[in-house]
C-alpha cells in the first residue's frame, strides 16, 4: 500500500541536482531573480517540486483508500452470500442423514428377525459342549493334586531330619553378623574423627587464604597510589619542560627579529660608505689646485669648521659598523647556543616520552598480572566452596546412613525373634524360614562385599583429598611468594621515586646498579636484610611456626649444600655471574627454582613412605618442592624473606613429625646427623609398591593423636592436615597400632550387626580417612 509513496523519495536528490544544473546553464537574462519576494530562487524551486510530489502522493493515497473501501463492501456482500449457501448445504445434509438412518434401521430390523432363531439353537449346543470339557479338566486336575500331595508328604518327612542342622547354621550366622556390626561401628567412629580433622584443616586453610587476599588487596592499593604519584610528578615535569620550551621559542623569535634589524642597518651603512669615499676624493682635488701653502693652510683653518663635521660623522659611522659586526658575531654565537639548548631540550623530551611509554607498558603488564592473580584467587575460593559443600554432604549422608542402619538392625532383630518363635511353635513353616535365611545370607554377603568395596574407595578418596590439601597449601605458599615479589617491586619503585625527587636528571643509572646499591633488599653482610630497612614487613600468618633446627644441617635450614641428591646446585650461577654456593650456605635465604629438573609428579612419588611393616630407610629426607620465583638470583626476596625464614611448609612438617615422634618413643635415636644419604632407594620402593600404593601412617604415639605445639603464636594440634591413611584395608599391621592398654580379647577384623547393646570403644582409634559407607537395601 505504501510503495508508490516510497518510490519518489530516493529520486528527489537527483531531481534537485538536475534542476540546479538547468538553472545554472540558463543565461543571466533567462534566470529568475535571486530573491523573489525575499526568498532565494533555489528554495522556491525546491518547494515547488516538493509540493508537486506531495500532491501526487496525496492523490495516490486517496485513490488507494477509496479502492480499499470498495473492496471491503464487495467482500461483505460475498461473505453474506457464502454464509447463506453454507446454511442451505447444512440443511440438505441433515435431511440426507435422517433419511439414511431410517433406511438402515429398517434393514437391521428385518435381518434380526431372520437370524434370532438360528442363534438360539447354536448357543444351546455350545453351552453343552463347554460343560463337558470343564468336567474332564476338573477330573485331571484332581488327579494331579493327589500326586503332588503324596510327594509333599515324602519331602516333609525328609526335612524333619534337617531341621536341627539348619538351626545350628542360623545361630552361627547370627554370631558372625554381630561381629560384623561391631566392626562397622568402630569404623563409623573413626570416620567421624577423620571428618572433624578435615574440618579443622579447612578452617585453617580458609584463614590463610583470607590473609593472602588481604595482602593482595593492600599491595594493589599501594601499587595504584605509587603509580598515581609517579604519573603526577611526570606530568608536572612535562608541563615545566613545555613552559621552558615556549620561553626558548619566544627568545629565539626575539633574537631573530634583532638580527634582521641589525642586518638591515648594516646594509644601509654599506650603502653610505661609497658616498663618503667620493666626498673625500673631491676634497683632496681641491687642496692640490692651490699654489700657496699659506693660503692652503688658511683655507684649511677657515674651512676646517665646515669640513670636520662630515669626516667625524663618517668615522663615527665606521666605528658603529665595526661595533655592529662584533655584536652580530656575538648574537650569532648566542643563537647557536640557543639552538643547541633547544636540541638538548628536544632530546630530553623524547627521552621522557620514551620513559613514559615504558612506564605505561609496565603498568599494563602489572594490570594483566593483577587480573591473573584475581582469577586464581576466585578459582581457589570456588574450590574451597566445593570442598566444604562436599564435606557437608558426606556428613549428612553419614548421619542418614547411621539412622538407616540402626533401624535396619532393629528390624532384623525383630525378624529373628519372630523366626525363633515360629520355629518353636510350628514345624511346618521350616521350609519358608530356610528360604528366608538363605535370602538373608545372600543379602549379607552382598552387603559385606559392598562395604568392603566402599571402604577401599573411600580410603582412596581420603588419600586423594590429602594430596589435594597438600597441593592447596603449596599453592598458598606460591601466592605468598608472589606477594613478596610484588612487595620487592614496590620497594624498588619507591626508591626510584625518591631518587627522581632528589635528582630528576639521574635517569641514566642502570637498573642493576640501582637495585644492588640502593635497594633495602640487597644482600647484607649477614645474608638477609634487617627488619627496620624494609618498607613492607610481612605479617605473621597462622601457618608460621617457630624456628626448628633441621637434622640435616647444624645451623638450620632444610637444604644443605652437601646433599648428594641435588648435584646441580653447586654449578648454578646467579644474575651477577657468581656461583650459587653462597645462596646455599645462607640458611635464611629463599630457595630458588633452578635446583630441580624433575616434574611435580616425580617429586610426589619421592614423598612416598615405606609400607607399615617396614622401617624408614636411612636415606635423605624426601626432597622439598622447590620455589617458583627468584630463579638464578642472589638477591634476597625482600619483604618475603622473613616468611621463608619463619614458616615451615607442609613438606617440612611431614618430614619433621616422624623424626620427632620416633625420638619421643626411643631415646637411643637422638643422633640424626647421618641422614644425608642419596634417595636412590625411594624410586625402587615406589615401583615395587605399584600404582595403587597408599602412604602409611605416622609412627605410633601414646596419648593424644596429635601433639600440642605450644611454641607457636597459636595453640593448635599437630600439623594443619591429618596424616595419610593406613596402607591396609580391614585391619592394619601390628607395627601401626599402639600397645593395648585395656584387657579383653582382640576385636574381630570385620564385624557386622549385633542384637546385643553396643560396647565401649577403645581409647585409641587408628585414623581411616575417607570412610563413608553407603548401604543399599
Swiss-Prot record:
BP GO annotations = endoplasmic reticulum to Golgi vesicle-mediated transport; protein secretion; vesicle cargo loading
Q: GO terms for CC?
A: endoplasmic reticulum exit site; endoplasmic reticulum membrane
Where, per UniProt, does this protein localize?
Membrane
Q: Which residues cross the membrane?
A: 39-59
Skewed-composition ranges (Polar residues): 530-541
Q: What is its main location?
A: membrane
Entry keywords, A to Z: Coiled coil, Membrane, Transmembrane, Transmembrane helix
Comp. bias intervals (Basic and acidic residues): 572-591, 649-672
Q: Which InterPro entries match?
A: cTAGE_MIA/OTOR
How is the protein disposed in the membrane?
Answer: Single-pass membrane protein
Region (Disordered), start-end ranges? 510-673, 721-742
**Which parts form a coiled-coil structure per UniProt?**
118-269, 339-498
Question: What's the family?
Answer: Belongs to the cTAGE family.
> What is the official name of this protein in its record?
cTAGE family member 8
Organism in which the protein naturally occurs:
Homo sapiens (Human)
Amino acid at each position: 500500500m505504501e510503495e508508490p509513496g516510497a518510490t519518489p523519495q530516493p529520486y528527489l536528490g537527483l531531481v534537485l541536482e538536475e534542476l540546479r544544473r538547468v538553472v545554472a546553464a540558463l543565461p543571466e537574462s533567462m534566470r529568475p531573480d535571486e530573491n523573489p519576494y525575499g526568498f532565494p530562487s533555489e528554495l522556491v524551486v525546491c518547494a515547488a517540486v516538493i509540493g508537486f510530489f506531495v500532491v501526487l502522493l496525496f492523490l495516490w493515497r486517496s485513490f488507494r483508500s477509496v479502492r480499499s473501501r470498495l473492496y471491503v463492501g464487495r467482500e461483505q456482500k460475498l461473505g453474506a452470500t457464502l454464509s447463506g449457501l453454507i446454511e442451505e448445504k447444512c440443511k440438505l445434509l441433515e435431511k440426507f442423514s435422517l433419511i439414511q438412518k431410517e433406511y438402515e434401521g429398517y434393514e437391521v430390523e428385518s435381518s434380526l428377525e431372520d437370524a434370532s432363531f438360528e442363534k438360539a439353537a447354536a448357543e444351546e449346543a455350545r453351552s453343552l459342549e463347554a460343560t463337558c470339557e470343564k468336567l474332564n479338566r476338573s477330573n485331571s486336575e484332581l488327579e494331579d493334586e493327589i500326586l503332588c500331595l503324596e510327594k509333599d508328604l515324602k519331602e516333609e518327612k525328609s526335612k524333619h531330619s534337617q531341621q536341627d542342622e539348619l538351626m545350628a547354621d542360623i545361630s552361627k550366622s547370627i554370631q558372625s553378623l554381630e561381629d560384623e556390626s561391631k566392626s562397622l561401628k568402630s569404623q563409623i567412629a573413626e570416620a567421624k574423627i577423620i571428618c572433624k580433622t578435615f574440618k579443622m584443616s579447612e578452617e585453617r586453610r580458609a584463614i590463610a587464604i583470607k590473609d593472602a587476599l588481604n595482602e593482595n588487596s593492600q599491595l594493589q592499593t599501594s601499587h595504584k597510589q605509587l603509580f598515581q604519584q609517579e604519573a603526577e610528578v611526570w606530568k608536572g615535569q612535562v608541563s615545566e619542560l613545555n613552559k621552558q620550551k615556549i620561553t626558548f621559542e619566544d627568545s629565539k623569535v626575539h633574537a631573530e627579529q634583532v638580527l634582521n634589524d641589525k642586518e638591515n642597518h648594516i646594509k644601509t651603512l654599506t650603502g653610505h660608505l661609497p658616498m663618503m669615499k667620493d666626498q673625500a676624493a673631491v676634497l683632496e682635488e681641491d687642496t692640490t689646485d692651490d699654489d700657496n701653502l699659506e693660503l692652503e693652510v688658511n683655507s684649511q683653518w677657515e674651512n676646517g669648521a665646515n669640513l670636520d663635521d662630515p669626516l667625524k660623522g663618517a668615522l663615527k659611522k665606521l666605528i658603529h659598523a665595526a661595533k655592529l659586526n662584533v655584536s652580530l658575531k656575538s648574537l650569532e654565537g648566542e643563537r647557536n647556543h640557543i639552538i643547541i639548548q633547544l636540541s638538548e631540550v628536544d632530546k630530553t623530551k623524547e627521552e621522557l616520552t620514551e620513559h613514559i611509554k615504558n612506564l605505561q607498558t609496565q603498568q599494563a603488564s602489572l594490570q594483566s598480572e593483577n587480573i591473573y592473580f584475581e582469577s586464581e584467587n576466585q578459582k581457589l575460593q570456588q574450590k574451597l566452596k566445593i570442598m566444604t559443600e562436599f564435606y557437608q554432604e558426606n556428613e549428612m549422608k553419614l548421619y542418614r546412613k547411621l539412622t538407616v542402619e540402626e533401624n535396619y538392625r532393629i528390624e532384623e532383630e525383630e525378624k529373628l525373634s519372630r523366626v525363633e518363635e515360629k520355629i518353636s511353635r510350628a514345624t511346618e513353616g521350616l521350609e519358608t524360614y530356610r528360604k528366608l535365611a538363605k535370602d538373608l545370607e545372600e543379602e549379607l554377603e552382598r552387603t559385606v562385599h559392598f562395604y568392603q568395596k566402599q571402604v577401599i574407595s573411600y580410603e582412596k578418596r581420603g588419600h586423594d583429598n590429602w594430596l589435594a590439601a597438600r597441593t592447596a597449601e603449596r599453592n598458598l605458599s606460591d601466592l605468598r611468594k608472589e606477594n613478596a615479589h610484588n612487595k620487592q617491586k614496590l620497594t624498588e619503585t619507591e626508591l626510584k621515586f625518591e631518587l627522581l625527587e632528589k635528582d630528576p636528571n639521574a635517569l641514566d643509572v642502570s637498573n642493576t646498579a640501582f637495585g644492588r646499591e640502593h635497594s633495602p633488599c640487597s644482600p647484607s653482610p649477614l645474608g638477609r636484610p634487617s627488619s627496620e630497612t624494609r618498607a613492607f614487613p610481612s605479617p605473621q600468618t597462622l601457618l608460621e611456626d617457630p624456628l626448628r633446627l633441621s637434622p640435616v644441617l647444624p645451623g638450620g635450614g632444610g637444604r644443605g649444600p652437601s646433599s648428594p641428591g641435588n648435584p646441580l646446585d653447586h654449578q648454578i650461577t646467579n644474575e651477577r655471574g657468581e656461583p650459587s654456593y653462597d645462596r646455599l650456605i645462607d640458611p635464611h635465604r629463599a630457595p630458588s627454582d633452578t635446583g630441580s629438573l624433575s616434574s611435580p609428579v616425580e617429586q610426589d612419588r619421592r614423598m612416598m613412605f615405606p609400607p607399615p611393616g617396614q622401617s624408614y630407610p636411612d636415606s635423605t629426607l624426601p626432597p622439598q618442592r622447590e620455589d617458583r620465583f627468584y630463579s638464578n638470583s642472589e638477591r634476597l626476596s625482600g619483604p618475603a624473606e622473613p616468611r621463608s625464614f619463619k614458616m615451615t611448609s607442609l613438606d617440612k612438617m611431614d618430614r619433621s613429625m616422624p623424626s620427632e615422634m620416633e625420638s619421643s618413643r626411643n631415646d637411643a635415636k637422638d643422633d640424626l646427623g647421618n641422614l644425608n644419604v642419596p634417595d636412590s632407594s625411594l624410586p625402587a620402593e615406589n615401583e615395587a609398591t605399584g600404582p595403587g600404593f597408599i602412604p602409611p601412617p605416622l609412627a605410633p604415639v601414646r596419648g593424644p593423636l596429635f601433639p600440642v605445639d605450644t611454641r607457636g603464636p597459636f595453640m593448635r594440634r599437630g600439623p594443619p592436615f591429618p596424616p595419610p591413611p593406613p596402607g591396609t584395608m580391614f585391619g592394619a599391621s601390628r607395627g601401626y597400632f599402639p600397645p593395648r592398654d585395656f584387657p579383653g580379647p582382640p576385636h574381630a577384623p570385620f564385624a557386622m550387626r549385633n542384637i546385643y547393646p553396643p560396647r565401649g570403644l577403645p581409647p585409641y582409634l587408628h585414623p581411616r580417612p575417607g570412610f563413608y559407607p553407603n548401604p543399599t537395601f
